[in-house]
Amino acid sequence: MDIRAAEISAILKSQIANFGEEAAVSDVGQVLSVGDGIARIYGLDNVQAGEMLEFPKAGVKGMALNLERDNVGAVIFGQDQEIKEGDEVRRLGEIVDVPVGRGLLGRVVNPLGEPIDGKGPIQYTERRRVDVKAPGIIPRKSVHEPVQTGLKSIDTLIPVGRGQRELIIGDRQTGKTAVAIDTILNQKAVNAGKDESAKLYCVYVAIGQKRSTVAQIVKTLEEHGALEYTTVVVASASEPAPLQYLAPFAGCAMGEWFRDNGLHGLIIYDDLSKQAVAYRQMSLLLRRPPGREAYPGDVFYLHSRLLERAAKLNEDNGSGSLTALPIIETQANDVSAYIPTNVISITDGQIFLETDLFYQGIRPAVNVGISVSRVGSSAQIKAMKQVAGPIKGELAQYREMAAFAKFGSDLDASTQKMLARGERLTELLKQPQYAPLSVEEQVCVIYAGTRGYLDGIPTSSVRRFEAEFLARLHSQHADLLEGIRTKKALDKDLENTLKSALDSFSSTFA
């Protein structure tokens, strides 16, 4: 082997010339104190608010939140037991972001977008910051397309539109999550079709819930074939407060990808009360001044900047939409507490679920008297508007009369008729869990209720009437259901067909 001196000297010269070029510049700080998931750091002079930090020794990440004169207050996304005073902290030079796109559908992820379902890495081509500005006024359009929840009491009386924020509020164990899950399950039919503009992709954000509860929800979605168009973001009760705070923003970024690509997204925050509690915990540990109920002063802004990101965009911006269904848990039906009033004032309406109704067997336990949708009937198809108009008035009169009827025994015939009709309509609006109805089925059933076909049958037989009538429609009048689905209106021919179907069915019903 011959050694060429010229070659060796050339290599040495090039190495000396290029020496030190790849030396990475990193802004490094030191941990001053750590505890309760909060670290005080000295030395990160150029760090940005919301920037990701790394604690290399402990192998965990964090986020800078408090930028003070002589130190930085950071929250830790993980266990802080491994972090010691004097440990090195590095800036990562990026604001918290998550992967977005279709690759997340059918997956269960944590608030940093990392998979926790054991199905391998996530395929994505794009990442988005979790906390971005909401669309302005000019790119928006008024809400005019329906989100079909599959629940008669909501689709007829409190319609939700694409791009709307509709709050689901009630005490614990009143069926708030059940309403949200039914809404996801009901999208299976439209998502199975070819029309991308009709599809509704779902994001379910579980904040501060038990892992067993979340596992049950994921199992339900999987069994009903709904997980394939749904992303589940989980920050369970055992996760640190910063991750529970971050989860809704991460889910929102994933939902916004659909909105900004001309598609339709639906996001469920279950629930924002727990996010507010996590934010309160972080703020108090960071020594921010407390306000009402010890929440920080900007807890309203926390929820408003999140919910304002749900919007319906106009044609110039792709006509996409993101619909939000935030959930708030009340204590003893107290809607005048701080967080409930905040979120009620931000959203475009609310669905009140009541414990009393739930225990009376009225499920979903929607109080149709005080629930409201500020979008109203512009979020309904024409057929639903035609049949749902009378039911609102009749139920309102029934509630008023029922209160008076408690005191008087001798009621005139018209009052008795009104009470009987109201009872049957209330019974008609009941529905079992995980059994959403398509809009054409709802139109036919509500039509039967408001046109007096139920008046002659006992209240206890209303549910049986509905089930058997729908079975008859599917077996003998499939063209009627198809007509309502395609025309989205109840024209004279369809109405006559529906009337004759009801007449023949009610004459044989016993």
Curated annotation (Swiss-Prot):
Pfam family membership, one: ATP-synt_ab
- SUPFAM superfamilies of this UniProt entry? C-terminal domain of alpha and beta subunits of F1 ATP synthase, N-terminal domain of alpha and beta subunits of F1 ATP synthase, P-loop containing nucleoside triphosphate hydrolases
* Molecular function, one GO term: proton-transporting ATP synthase activity, rotational mechanism
What is its subcellular localisation?
Answer: Cell inner membrane
Q: Which UniProt keywords apply?
A: ATP synthesis, ATP-binding, Cell inner membrane, Cell membrane, CF(1), Hydrogen ion transport, Ion transport, Membrane, Nucleotide-binding, Translocase, Transport
Tell whether Glycoprotein is among the UniProt keywords: no
> Where this protein primarily resides, as one coarse class?
membrane
Which CDD domains does UniProt cross-reference here? Answer: ATP-synt_F1_alpha_C, ATP-synt_F1_alpha_N, F1-ATPase_alpha_CD
Q: Which InterPro entries match?
A: ATP_synth_asu-like_sf, ATP_synth_asu_C, ATP_synth_asu_C_sf, ATP_synth_F1_a_nt-bd_dom, ATP_synth_F1_asu, ATPase_a/bsu_AS, ATPase_F1/V1/A1_a/bsu_N, ATPase_F1/V1/A1_a/bsu_N_sf
Q: Name one GO cellular component term.
A: plasma membrane
Keyword field contains ATP-binding: yes
Record-listed ATP binding positions: 170-177
**Enzyme Commission number(s) from the entry:** 7.1.2.2
Q: Where is this site: Required for activity?
A: 371
Annotated membrane topology:
Peripheral membrane protein
Give the function comment from the record: Produces ATP from ADP in the presence of a proton gradient across the membrane. The alpha chain is a regulatory subunit.
**What is stated as this protein's family in its record?**
Belongs to the ATPase alpha/beta chains family.
Q: What's the subunit arrangement here?
A: F-type ATPases have 2 components, CF(1) - the catalytic core - and CF(0) - the membrane proton channel. CF(1) has five subunits: alpha(3), beta(3), gamma(1), delta(1), epsilon(1). CF(0) has three main subunits: a(1), b(2) and c(9-12). The alpha and beta chains form an alternating ring which encloses part of the gamma chain. CF(1) is attached to CF(0) by a central stalk formed by the gamma and epsilon chains, while a peripheral stalk is formed by the delta and b chains.
Q: What is this protein called?
A: ATP synthase subunit alpha
